[in-house]
């Protein structure tokens, strides 16, 4: 089975959707997600500064509505709605998370909690919401792994 086949099989399994650490190249994930018709968002957290930095990057990338309140509750609300991005599913690829987590551990951990809750909410509705967390080789974020 090729990597693409494995990714297509994985992305089609809504019950497994959630937040994962992955070393799979973002281009491979993107290609598989496009094949199954998902919205794809690559978000670089490398020089994001704390809570405001991650909130702003996610909001901008996912084109959150103007009413987004720029706090964790508002992030949770928008991620569990996504009506303006209706589709078969969503894939977020968060890159350079090792840098962000090292400099802003509390904000990283809270963001992962919010993303996991959003994924669980979408799983209940049978819509896949995937988050692939990426960082430098050797970094261990304590998340379930999907590796090449």
Per-region residue spans from a language model:
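Mid-chain, well-packed structural core segment of small domains
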Residues: 80-107
């Amino acid at each position: 089975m090729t990597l693409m086949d494995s990714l297509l099989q994985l992305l089609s399994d809504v019950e497994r959707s959630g937040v994962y650490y992955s070393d799979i190249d973002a281009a491979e994930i993107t290609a598989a997600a496009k094949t199954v018709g998902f919205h794809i968002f690559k978000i670089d957290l490398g020089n994001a500064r704390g809570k405001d930095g991650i909130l702003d990057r996610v909001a901008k990338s996912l084109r959150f509505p103007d009413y987004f309140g720029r706090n964790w509750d508002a992030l949770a609300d928008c991620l569990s709605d996504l009506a303006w991005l209706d589709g078969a599913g969503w894939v977020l690829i968060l890159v350079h998370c090792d840098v962000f987590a090292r400099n802003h551990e509390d904000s990283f951990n809270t963001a992962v909690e919010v993303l996991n809750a959003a994924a669980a909410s979408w799983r209940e509705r049978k819509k896949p919401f995937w988050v692939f967390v990426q960082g430098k080789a050797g970094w261990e974020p304590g998340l379930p792994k999907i590796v090449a």
